[in-house]
Amino acid sequence: MVHKNILRFMLNIFSSSQLVLTYFILAIAIVFNNTFALFLFFTQIFKTFILFYPKKIFKDSSLGNRPKGAYDCNLFNCGGKPNTGAIISGHMTSITMLFTSLLLSMNVADIFNKKILMLGSFIIITTGISRFLTKCHTLFQIVLGCFTGIILGFTSFKIQSLITNNRFNKDKNKVLNIFKLI
């Protein structure tokens, strides 16, 4: 029984990576008064609204149902039995969107870092595995979340390139330089 509880605890930690990253971005935005980090934070919030209708529409379909035995599947992994649709994994969408946007921005700023690519891949893979093992999502829902995250991350990156505000661009370089240190 202890082994099972430890396993569940570890799976919940890996499953919560998107929440930790969102809090990290919010902390950067507040502590450093950083407009780019605030932009990234709001894209994470906006993602929730984008996924609301697909989850609602497909909730009772075979594609949208959570696997049997799903438990603690909400944003904070503390929600008991889930009653929301599972199609398009929000956790996977969030972290894939964030890393896609950051990696594209770093590439354009000529500070691409393979370690960030490896770290992002590790976080995405471990989150996907934990969402699958906790029975919160099927493999299809996880992969669909990743594809949705890539599309939203690319869209976020394109929106960033349209913003010509000097402060935003300086703040963007500050955030990207944090990841350069890794």
Language-model region placement:
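Hydrophobic alpha-helical bundle signature of multipass membrane enzymes
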Residues: M1-L133
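A cytosolic-side transmembrane-helix exit/cap motif
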Residues: I57-R66, T138-I142, S161-D171
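Alpha-helical transmembrane segments that form the membrane-embedded catalytic/substrate-binding core
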Residues: H91-I95, R131, C136-S161
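Multi-pass membrane proteins that catalyze or facilitate reactions on polyprenyl-/lipid-phosphate substrates
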Residues: V2, I45, N113-I116, G120, ...
